[in-house]
């Protein structure tokens, strides 16, 4: 099957007015933002989360901040999270679209696009590439189709920003018959990288490195606004060490664990998705704040895990500087990149010892703003 392509990106038309809901689903929570389109201009009304567990009802928290006194609205969600969101958004204005962040589009979907039955079927086939992320996203899409009948649903991919990686970066070191299946470096956190460029549009940077550090972490090299290399590869498991994922790992380790029957395939996948990374090394939950606190208390495993994470990110940044032939700006973003000051400072110290002192910035990852933009663009085009 050939690639399923979306329409070329363009400036949104000035016609559709109303509410766009942007959704970013996790394993136990749903992050969302609500935007209003007014004559082509997008403004965020607010953002929030719906947290749920097996012990009680879900809880919706929504922070209003557009043109109002800041206020937080909280409520228990007796029905579904989507039903609560529909009620909340509809109280603001007519809902005109729902935008979904999708981690992976598989071998055939490269662009942001409207979610048709054929597209959703292709996304279901793509779940082996992102088994942690895509199934809950697809469940949410199904629920939104039921809850918002007739309302356009749009999928915004984390891989689209990297779709034109040069062959030197995109090509995997595998035989041609395997590459011809469509296996390549896809790259991730593309919406985050794009949001960084949007925030820098008044001060363009020629050689930019973006370090998106969070539960998943990646480092991307950008030349004149275009991705030229990135640390994650075919799936979001590769590259730097992460909270629960190992990053790049010698495949021989996996062969050994399978051949010696320490793990079957499903258990091995669970190991690499949930039990590895800094959580595995430190024997903690993988939260960077807890890891830092444990390290400060003298926990040797926590210190080792933190040291490994810092060095892994620093090595990725240094490698991207080689790709770019230097660096004009290093941007930290993502939850850890924005808020873990001590970790960020240690990474900078390590790269300064060999790269000098590159200019640095800390910027928020505004993925939902990009989802709103692309969603409006697609329903107008």
How should these model regions be labeled?
Residues 85-134, 151-154, 160-171:
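Short beta-strand-loop/turn "lid" adjacent to the catalytic site in phosphate-handling enzymes
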Residues 250-253, 257-284:
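Oxyanion-binding "anion nests"
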Residues 270, 277-281, 288-323:
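Adenine-nucleotide phosphate-binding core of ATP-dependent small-molecule kinases
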Residues 161-258:
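Glycine-rich phosphate-binding loop of actin/hexokinase-like ATP-binding domains
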Residues 25-76, 233:
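Short glycine-rich, Thr/Ser-proximal phosphate-binding strand/loop in the N-terminal lobe
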Residues 11-17, 135-148, 189-208:
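Conserved phosphate-binding catalytic cores of ATP/NTP-utilizing and phosphoryl-transfer enzymes
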Residues 328-350:
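Glycine-rich phosphate-binding loops at beta-strand->alpha-helix junctions
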Residues 357-381:
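Glycine-rich phosphate-binding/hydrolytic loop that grips phosphoryl groups
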């Amino acid at each position: 099957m050939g690639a399923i392509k979306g329409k070329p990106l363009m400036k949104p038309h000035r016609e559709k007015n109303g509410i766009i809901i942007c959704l970013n689903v996790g394993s136990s929570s749903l992050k969302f933002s609500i935007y209003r389109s007014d004559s082509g201009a997008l403004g965020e009304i607010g953002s929030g989360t719906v947290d749920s567990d097996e012990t009680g009802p879900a809880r919706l928290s929504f922070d209003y901040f557009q043109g109002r006194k800041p206020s937080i609205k909280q409520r228990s969600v007796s029905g579904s999270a989507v039903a609560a969101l529909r009620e909340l958004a509809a109280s603001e204005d007519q809902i005109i679209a729902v935008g979904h962040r999708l981690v992976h589009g598989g071998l055939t979907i490269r662009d942001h696009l409207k979610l048709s039955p054929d597209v959703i079927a292709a996304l279901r086939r793509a779940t082996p590439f992102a088994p942690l992320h895509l199934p809950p996203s697809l469940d949410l899409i199904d629920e939104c189709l039921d809850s918002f009948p007739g309302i356009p649903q749009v999928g915004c991919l984390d891989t689209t920003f990297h779709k034109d990686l040069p062959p030197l970066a995109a090509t995997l070191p595998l035989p041609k018959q395997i590459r011809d299946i469509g296996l390549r470096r896809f790259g991730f956190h593309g919406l985050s990288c794009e949001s960084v460029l949007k925030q820098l549009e008044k001060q363009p940077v020629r050689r930019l490195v973006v370090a998106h550090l969070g539960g998943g972490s990646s480092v991307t090299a950008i030349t004149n606004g275009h991705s030229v290399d990135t640390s994650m590869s075919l799936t979001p498991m590769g590259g730097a060490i992460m909270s629960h994922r190992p990053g790049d790992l010698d495949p021989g380790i996996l062969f050994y664990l399978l051949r010696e029957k320490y793990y079957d395939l499903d258990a091995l996948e669970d190991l690499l998705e949930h039990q590895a990374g800094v959580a595995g090394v430190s024997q903690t939950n993988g939260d960077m704040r807890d890891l830092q606190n444990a390290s400060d208390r003298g926990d040797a495993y926590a210190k080792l895990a933190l040291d490994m994470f810092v060095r892994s990110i620093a090595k990725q940044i240094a490698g991207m500087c080689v790709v770019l032939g230097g660096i004009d700006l290093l941007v930290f973003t993502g939850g850890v990149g924005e808020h873990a000051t001590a970790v960020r400072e240690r990474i900078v110290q390590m790269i300064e010892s060999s790269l000098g002192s590159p200019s640095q910035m800390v910027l928020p990852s505004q993925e939902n703003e990009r989802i709103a933009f692309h969603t409006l663009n697609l329903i107008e085009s």
